[in-house]
Swiss-Prot record:
Motif (C(P)XCG motif 2): 26-30
Domain notes: Contains four C(P)XCG motifs, suggesting the presence of two zinc binding pockets (ZBPs), but only ZBP2 (comprised of C(P)XCG motifs 2 and 4) is occupied by zinc.
Taxonomic superkingdom: Archaea
Annotated keywords: Metal-binding, Zinc
Motif C(P)XCG motif 3 boundaries: 37-41
Subunit structure: Monomer in solution.
Name assigned to this protein: Zinc finger protein MJ0458.1
The keyword Zinc belongs to this UniProt entry's keyword annotation: yes
Motif extent (C(P)XCG motif 1): 8-12
Species whose genome carries this gene: Methanocaldococcus jannaschii (strain ATCC 43067 / DSM 2661 / JAL-1 / JCM 10045 / NBRC 100440) (Methanococcus jannaschii)
Length: 57
């Protein structure tokens, strides 16, 4: 099986295996895993949950 690839929800960049990214459930609905790259985390780039529309920094 291949390694799971993650994409940043803010910038759509593929996340490198050793990058300091983060993954967490949507704070509002909890049904979608939000994945953010290190750059977007540091710059507080916004993201939007595709399921419920919640927007976060």
């Amino acid at each position: 099986m291949g390694e799971m690839k993650y994409v940043c929800i803010s910038c759509n960049a593929e996340i490198a295996p050793r990058e300091k990214s983060t993954k967490f459930p949507c704070p509002n609905c909890g049904e979608v895993e939000i994945v953010r790259c290190e750059r977007c985390r540091k710059l507080n780039n916004p993201y939007k949950c595709p399921k419920c529309g919640f927007e976060g920094p």
